Each structure stands twice: as C-alpha cells, then as structure tokens.
Amino acid sequence: AGNRTEAVQALFLTVALGIYFTILQAWEYYDSPFTIADSVYGSTFFVATGFHGLHVINSTTFLLVCLFRLINFHFSAHHHFGFEAAAWYWDFVDVVVAFSLYMHIWWGS
C-alpha cells in the first residue's frame, strides 16, 4: 500500500509535536511573570499567542482524526481529501505565524 507505514509514522510525529507545542505554551503561560491585564504587552502577547495556540489545537485535532482514519484504512491514493484539508490548515497556521512574527519584529524596530 505504497508508503502507508511511513505516512502513519510521520503523521504520528506531527501530532506528537503539536501536542508538545501546546504543553510548552501552557507551561509558558503558567510561568509568565506578567498577565493579560498587566500592560499592552501582556494583552498583545496573550491574545496573539493564544489565537495561535487555539489554531494549533484545532490543527492537531484534525490531524489526530486523520491519523486514526489512516490507521483504519479510510484513505486511499484517490480518496484522502480529509487529510489534504487538515494538512493545508496546518500549513496555513504556519504561514500566518511566520507573517505575524515578521510584522511584530518589523513594527517593534
């Protein structure tokens, strides 16, 4: 069945990294010396990273569903739109974050 084993492994790793990122972000929030109510910086930080975190959670959930579907042979070489849509969403989140970071750095300089 082609590269199914490699696809399962790669998708598992992607989901694991998404979960790891979410845990690190929660830890960062817990350990932060400021709150959302402290200043404009705190508000901006928590809103920007919070929206990104929510999108990562959504993306990870979509990819986790795709992983279960892949393991259960729900995808084929011609029938895999759910996975393709989840992958596009995951990449969209990456592009938005890259643009957002660039804009914050540019505006901050």
Curated annotation (Swiss-Prot):
Keywords for this entry?
Answer: Membrane, Mitochondrion, Mitochondrion inner membrane, Translocase, Transmembrane, Transmembrane helix
Q: Name one GO molecular function term.
A: cytochrome-c oxidase activity
Q: Which reaction does it catalyse?
A: 4 Fe(II)-[cytochrome c] + O2 + 8 H(+)(in) = 4 Fe(III)-[cytochrome c] + 2 H2O + 4 H(+)(out)
What Gene Ontology terms for biological process does this UniProt record contain? mitochondrial electron transport, cytochrome c to oxygen
Please give the PROSITE patterns that the UniProt record associates with this protein.
Answer: COX3 (PS50253)
- By its UniProt entry, which CDD domains does this protein fall under? Cyt_c_Oxidase_III
Q: How does it sit in the membrane?
A: Multi-pass membrane protein
| UniProt cross-references to InterPro entries, sorted A to Z | Cyt_c/ubiquinol_Oxase_su3, Cyt_c_oxase_su3_dom, Cyt_c_oxidase-like_su3, Cyt_c_oxidase_su3-like_sf, Cyt_c_oxidase_su3_a-hlx
Q: GO CC terms for this protein?
A: mitochondrial inner membrane
EC category: translocase
Subcellular location field = Mitochondrion inner membrane
The Enzyme Commission number assigned here is 7.1.1.9
UniProt-listed Pfam families: COX3
Disulfide-bonded cysteine pairs: these are none
Q: Which PANTHER family is this protein grouped with? A: CYTOCHROME C OXIDASE SUBUNIT 3 (PTHR11403:SF7), CYTOCHROME C OXIDASE SUBUNIT III (PTHR11403)
Q: Which family does it belong to?
A: Belongs to the cytochrome c oxidase subunit 3 family.
This protein is called Cytochrome c oxidase subunit 3
Q: Which organism is it from?
A: Arbacia lixula (Black urchin)
